[in-house]
Structure formats: C-alpha cells, structure tokens
C-alpha cells in the first residue's frame, strides 16, 4: 500500500511539473506571437486604418439599445473587467479541458477586437494567450467606448457585411442611427455565428438568437421583461 501511495504521489508530481512546463511554453509562445504582431504593425496604426474607412460609424451614431444588446450578449462585464473576463475564460477553459479541445472561447469584446485586428479565426491556445496580452495593451490606450466603437466596425455580420453600417444598410436599408429597437436587437445577435444567423440565409435562426439577446438584456437589467416582449412583437 505504501509503495502504491508513493507511486501515485510521484505520478501527481510529474503531472504537475508537466502541466507547469506546458503552461509556461504556451504563455511564452503567445507572448512572442503578440509582440511579433504589434512590432510588425502597431495597434495605433491598425486602429487608424479602421477609423479611416468610409463605412466607419461613430458610437454616438448608434442606437443605445444596439450597444446595450451587444454588451449584454457578447460581454456583459465589459465595462468592469480590464480587457479579459477571467470568470468567462475560466468557465470556457473547464469546458475546453472536458472536451480536450478549444470548443468554447470565452473571449470578450476586447479580445474579439484583437482577433479581428491581428489574428485568424483558427482556434489555438497560443493565439488566445496572444489575445490576452494584446487586450491589456488595447485597454491601456483606449477607452471602453472607443473599443466598443472599433468592435462594431470590425465584426462580421454575414452576407459579406464586415461592419455595422454595411449590415444595417444591407439588411434593413437604413443607416445604423435609424434602426429601431427590433432591428437593433436582431442585428446584435448575428456576429456570434454570422454564417448561421445571416438574415439572407436563416432568418428563423436569427430571430431565435434575437430572443436570446433580449433574455440577456432583461437578465442584466437593460430592459424589463415587458419591454423585451414589446420589442419581439413589433
């Protein structure tokens, strides 16, 4: 029995050492990926590239309910975390470990913006770590509203629409500032899975996603249940 216990202790120790070594390696690789990316093209340069586009929309030209919907469904702790939502990442990490792959990202708005600016959509641990380093830098240089503004101007909405203005014009035939509450909450749900929720492909799925958006808005006190129901029955 004592021999068995010793063997178990040794195996546990080996696993811990191997785990620490693997984590250290991934962190080092992720940091290198982040440094290489920003040295090649600084964040400020990337940001100005987006802001200079003809279809760029400023945050004060967007309906407040649209912004609230985005935050509710994508990153409800956006205004309180430092660029990375540790709780969301921890929950996602547990699910990833169970599945033995990156099945759940846990990325918030800032991390998604970093991915859109620099990285591919391919799910890799090193890329996720690079996003974390870049998110901290982005949050040091820009306000939350500036980050949210950049986010909605760089995310994909399906049907070849890569910003909120193109999506609003393409799906509804109007500028973002003219979207009503129904359109705003409908559009907010699409970027989670644009190929699935694109209104030109799967309108029924998009409306199911909209219900999820409204549920989140009620949960995080952006809307009352009565207001959410009124929007759905618009």
Predicted features, each with a name:
Residues 1-234:
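Juxtamembrane regions of bacterial inner-membrane/periplasmic proteins
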């Amino acid at each position: 029995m004592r021999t068995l216990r010793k063997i178990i202790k040794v195996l546990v120790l080996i696993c811990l050492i191997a785990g620490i070594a693997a984590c250290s390696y991934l962190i080092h690789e992720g940091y290198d990926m982040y440094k290489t990316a920003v040295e090649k093209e600084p964040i400020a340069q990337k940001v100005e590239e987006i802001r200079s586009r003809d279809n760029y929309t400023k945050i004060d030209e967007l309906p407040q309910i649209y912004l609230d919907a985005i935050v509710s469904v994508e990153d409800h702790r956006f205004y309180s975390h430092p660029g990375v939502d540790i709780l969301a990442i921890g929950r996602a990490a547990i699910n990833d470990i169970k599945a033995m792959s990156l099945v759940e990202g846990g990325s918030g708005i800032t991390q998604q913006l970093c991915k859109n600016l620099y990285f591919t959509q391919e799910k890799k641990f090193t890329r996720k770590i690079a996003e974390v380093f870049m998110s901290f830098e982005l949050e040091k240089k820009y306000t939350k509203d500036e980050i949210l503004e950049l986010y909605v101007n760089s995310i994909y909405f399906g049907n070849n629409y890569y910003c909120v203005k193109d999506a609003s014009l393409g799906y509804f035939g109007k500028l973002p500032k003219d979207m009503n509450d129904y359109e705003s909450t409908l559009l907010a749900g699409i970027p989670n899975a644009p190929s699935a929720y694109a209104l030109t492909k799967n309108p029924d799925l998009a409306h199911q996603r909209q219900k999820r958006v409204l549920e989140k808005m009620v949960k995080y006190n952006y809307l009352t249940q009565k207001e959410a129901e009124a929007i759905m029955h618009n």
